[in-house]
Amino acid sequence: MKEKAESSVACNHHKVGFLGLLVTLGIVFGDIGTSPLYVMKAILHTGESISESTILGALSCIIWTLTLQTTIKYVCVALRADNNGEGGILALYALLRRLKYKWIYLLAIIGASTLLADGIITPAITVTTAIEGLESISPNLPVIPITLGIITIIFFVQRFGTESIGKSFGVFMLLWFLLLGVVGAFSITSYPLILKAFNPYYAAMLLAKSPEWFLILGAVFLCTTGAEALYSDLGHCGRKNIAISWGFVKTMLILNYLGQGAWVLNHADTALAANPFFAIMPQSMLFFAIIMATGAAIVASQALISGTFSILSEAMNLHFWPRMRIKHPTHVKGQLYIPMINLAMYIGVVLIILLFRDSSHMEAAYGLAITITMLMTTLLLGFYLHSKGVARIFTMLFMGAYCIIEAIFLTANLSKFLAGGWCTMLIGGILFLMMYVWVKAMKIRRHYISTKPLDDYYQIISDIKADESIPKYASNLVYVNHANKEGAVDDKLLYSIINKQPKRADHYWLINMEFVDTPDTLEYNCETLIPDTLYSVTMHIGFRIEPRVSLYLRQVVEDLVADGKVDLQSTYPSLRKYGIPGDFRFIIIHRVYYPESSDNRQQNLLMSIYALISKIGIDEPKALGLDTSMVVVERVPLIINHPVIKDKVIKVINDSETSQSRQ
């Protein structure tokens, strides 16, 4: 007998309309929308002399980078590579992990690690640059303390959720982009020839002739760092809303970049002393522009923090990261808060600000890690296109073209390594090591779980239930079954029921958890193995769904009771006459690794690191969403390749030898 619950609500795709487009502006484009704050300033500080050919070439590079990277790769191609409406590098990997290429997970964890590392510096550089605009009004203003204060507030409010203020993000970002476009267009009128930058000839000439081309490309790349976040936010807004909004956003961005370029050419002698973004603002609007820039930086930071929580939540369900405590501060679908990650990010951002002190130095650390993320996304997109039967020639051209483009950007950004890029690469390297060790250790743990055919034990389980000489352990006894074979059961689970302390119960429940490739699936199958005694419940959980076994099992039980397929009333007469249901108790089998159980040094080292990493997570009962007052954890050793004992450790002494020794 099998029963199946209805799937959870599918991904919430907003319909195309003004409201949907407005929400998209507030959620998706914060990162890429704040890039005009620092891109042109970074280009001017590469050391290249300011001339018309240099500025036209740099602007042409910006326009065509936005076109090739953001428009074609992400909006036209990547947004179509959705996993039931969800996007991002881990959602893309979830579509591909069943392929024959078992090493493909490396691309996903490299990309996720560098994306998370880059996220540490984004709030620092955007907020710092915005506050630095105040120096044009008050040169002695303490930028660092103000920046740290704003950053502290941003991270502090995460615990309360951002539902109330989040609704206004879209309106604010609409005003922000209009400000960018209008001010930029006004500045263009002072140097109309700046429009020649649309011609890619100027980009080609700059790259061919400038000795500082790699430094300029490293600065230009900052204009598209938010493209990966655009893909990750696909599930929040839908492809059409993002694509339509991008047309507006791109236009406003290009107008602003061109306006900054026009100002630079009109003020070539003094351009290095100012930030072109604030310089093109009319003096009467400067303070307003600084307030708007600070607000946009806050929106970008908020989107990035929320994105980090979502990425790590996905990583947990894909077994890339240890389970951590997740809170839901509001009723908004998908809004998460991970306290430990919030604290770690806050400390990281504060250290970045204190280490680099100003946005010019932060620019040197920015962009290197995200280039690697984009390269990994390109490779995964290539596998995706191939798996969907896209023409081989198109797939090869796509992968080849973008691997070359991103390899060039990576080479250019490597010039930033000693100047600050080492920081994000170090963070990314640590995160990659943690994910890699976690994946390998989980494989080892699964490999050494011994299983047995469950149907061989039906009779003994029935006999234990009927044997009233055994004290009743619980009315309903629930185990999480870690066997990954159909019809099999973890042998330590059987040992717990039968050998360790025979556990008599009215009903035995075996919970099998299967994390599926789709994001929002939440289904179950329930099979009665022994009528009115043993049940097997398989929960199919999407990679964006948080496991909450107690809640899900309650629904399963209620469904079965409603259908008259199980009687959960207490068997004790004094309780049954009042309609009181039987109690539930959960048994968790926790395997403890002992280095002595293996003579493989490499494996011992890996499992030792795994043990350290697991300390940042929560224990299995909390990870599964169980009521800890109803849980018993039984610890058993994880035996791995125990070395064969060739010689007896303890010698048997016969009676004659004993008597002789006593004499």
What are these regions (language model features)?
Residues 2-663:
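The structured alpha-helical core of multi-pass membrane proteins
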